[in-house]
Amino acid sequence: MLSPPHSGTLEKLFQYIDLHQDEFVQTLKEWVAIESDSVQPMPRLRQELFRMMALAADKLRNLGARVDSVDLGSQQMPDGQSLPTPPIILAELGNDPKKPSVCFYGHLDVQPAQKEDGWLTDPYTLTEVDGKLYGRGATDNKGPVLAWINAVSTFRALQQDLPVNVKFILEGMEEAGSVALEELVKREKDNFFSGVDYIVISDNLWLSQKKPALTCGTRGNCYFTVEVKCRDQDFHSGTFGGILNEPMADLVALLGSLVDSSGHILVPGIYDQMAPITEEEKTMYENIDLDLEEYQKSSRVERFLFDTKEELLTHLWRYPSLSIHGIEGAFDEPGTKTVIPGRVLGKFSIRLVPHMTPSVVETQVTQHLEAVFSKRNSFNKMAVSMVLGLQPWTANINGTQYLAARRAIQTVFGVDPDMIQDGSTIPIAKIFQDITQKSVMMLPLGAVDDGEHSQNEKINRWNYIQGSKLFAAFFLELSKLHSGQQVPSGAF
């Protein structure tokens, strides 16, 4: 294990964070109390979002940061109403050319939550039970944002020189698709981002409950709809059953042609683009700390498709997967309605892995469904549409900031982190990497059972406080490595 850097400084920083942890938890409580729901297009909730962004801006100003709240205008909703879009916060603290500049991305909006959804506590009242801090946004993403701020404020409180220049980009519309964020990043490429060396995102989770992780890749996502239509009106099955091609039967056949019972995608050529899995990756998966029995139990699944850790992780991270999500237009209420839908719309998505591109996948899927539909000789009309196409993201794990993060994790947690990938899609990582051409890293703080987006979302007090220490140690390590000091042989 590597010896901790600046041990005297670290000891003071860690001691301060421990002594002030109740204060840090109280601030998180104040932030969680704001119902900053960006998903439901309601004027009251937009006001809450603006209040949340203003509170964060004030917090950063109190740190001494120069803060710019970028006005994004308004958002036209499908029903015709116009709602104001909360500003994106761009903040800067320090501009010493001798120091590395690191930009932290976070979001302050949350998914909808109501106690009647199955919460054991009020989702907007941070409640501590057995060291777990329950509340909407506690782990996604208000807790990690505050952990970063806690680290910066600790240096300031102790009058310690902050070893890095810090920038913040905080948004309030991530859960609603990051409205206008990509355009802002493009616009600020040669301004706000010009002096940035590294970008850090802390918006995902560890793979376990206790062992920290670094995320080095995410899958992409292509979301499709397939419509089968006979007419706009539904049919009575007693009057029309047996004398026409039923749209639902066509759609079920189409959806059933996409994937088999073992999870293998049946679209011809879909695996051809996939990057080969290297021996280095296989070794990495072997070294990851994952208790399959615990993982299965916490998932409340009777059995997974794969029996080994390596197979499960490979199929979760490095193989594409296809999921069927739902059908519009079908009768799905209690009772026995004998209707034949006149039009149905199926929804499914494919998670992409390195070297796969949305445009090629779109062509392959469309050609496959057209071929299947043609063989049915149906008189109905079929239309396939790709409504979302997001590429996978891969990081350079041998870059400076991954080395710094690994060393910081070793210092704070006393273990080497799991190097994990994320089977989901986090578009902002790819957006930052492609537009700014800067080094992007995902450094999660939350445990696997934090329940982001779910009922009873939480962050452990331990994760929140140790995460604040982690970011403080990361600043020191990044400064040390960026200045050109040698990394010991075998450090990564």
Swiss-Prot record:
Binds 2 Zn(2+) ions per subunit. Its main location: secreted. GO terms for molecular function: carboxypeptidase activity; dipeptidase activity; metal ion binding; metallodipeptidase activity. GO terms for biological process: proteolysis; regulation of protein metabolic process. Keywords: Carboxypeptidase, Hydrolase, Metal-binding, Metalloprotease, Phosphoprotein, Protease, Secreted, Zinc. Zn(2+) 1 binds at residues 140, 175, 453. The modification Phosphoserine is found at residue 194. SUPFAM superfamilies: Zn-dependent exopeptidases (SSF53187). InterPro entries: ArgE/DapE_CS, CNDP/DUG1, Cyt/Met_Dipeptidase, Peptidase_M20, Peptidase_M20_dimer. The keyword Phosphoprotein applies. The keyword Cytoplasm does not apply. Zn(2+) 2 binds at residues 107, 140, 203. It comes from the Eukaryota. Detected exclusively in kidney. Its EC number is 3.4.13.20. It is found in: Secreted. Catalyzes the peptide bond hydrolysis in Xaa-His dipeptides, displaying the highest activity toward carnosine (beta-alanyl-L-histidine) and anserine (beta-alanyl-3-methyl-histidine). Homodimer. Belongs to the peptidase M20A family. This is Beta-Ala-His dipeptidase. It comes from Rattus norvegicus.
